[in-house]
A protein has these predicted regions:
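Membrane-embedded, hydrophobic transmembrane alpha-helices
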Residues: 1-6
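Residue-level signature of transmembrane alpha-helical entry/exit and packing/kink sites
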Residues: 9-13, 115, 164-168
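Membrane-interface alpha helices of multi-pass inner-membrane proteins
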Residues: 164-180
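Active-site lumenal/periplasmic loops and adjacent helix-entry segments of GT-C-fold
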Residues: 9-10, 18-144
Length: 182
């Protein structure tokens, strides 16, 4: 079976988005995961105080890495309800995850088919379906970290690598303010 690039990209997007939509559909109005509750506390603190780094005794590290919650607050400031803003961040993060995973593997192997297969293999893991569908900092940090790899892989073959390396640097800074382990 040979897919066009457009068909492969559509399949990658579907593999990325549908599992998170199905998992979130079980309780669309409330985050029920333990980590999600902890991050919602940090998000609520940022929204109510209009400032970062408010203490969260439930997850002390969370306020020190507010990238996820700050991004959600920015989306919320567009007039979108808090839960909907959080869903936007989760879904966009998932789209970035599958597209940069596909691109990274394609850049490293030279095969667009390998990129699509990498996404399909990752999509069958429980981590992909559940852990990376949560409202938690790794959901945003992993795609950002993988974007660094993708941009550096592209830069090595580029005639003008500086913009790509600049983008990788921005992504590294975003990871640094989003997750303490990634």
């Amino acid at each position: 079976l040979s897919l066009s690039r457009r068909s492969r990209n559509a399949a990658v997007v579907c593999l990325g988005v549908f599992p998170v939509l199905m998992w979130r559909a079980s309780n669309p109005l409330l985050f029920t995961g333990f980590d999600e509750q902890l991050h919602m506390r940090t998000l609520g603190d940022i929204i109510s105080s209009h400032g970062l780094f408010q203490a969260n005794p439930l997850l002390e590290v969370s306020p020190r890495y507010p990238g996820l919650e700050a991004t959600t607050t920015l989306v919320h400031q567009l007039g979108i309800p808090t839960m909907a803003a959080a869903y936007v961040v989760i879904i966009v993060s998932r789209l970035v995850l599958v597209t940069v995973l596909c691109d990274t593997v394609e850049q490293l192997t030279g095969s667009s088919r390998a990129g699509g297969i990498a996404v399909a293999v990752y999509a069958i893991s429980p981590q992909f379906v559940f852990f990376n569908s949560q409202y938690a900092y790794q959901t945003m940090a992993i795609p950002l970290a993988l974007a660094v790899v993708s941009l550096v892989a592209r830069a090595r073959l580029s005639d003008n690598p500086l913009p790509l390396l600049g983008g990788a640097t921005v992504c590294l800074f975003a990871v640094a303010v989003t997750h303490h382990v990634t």
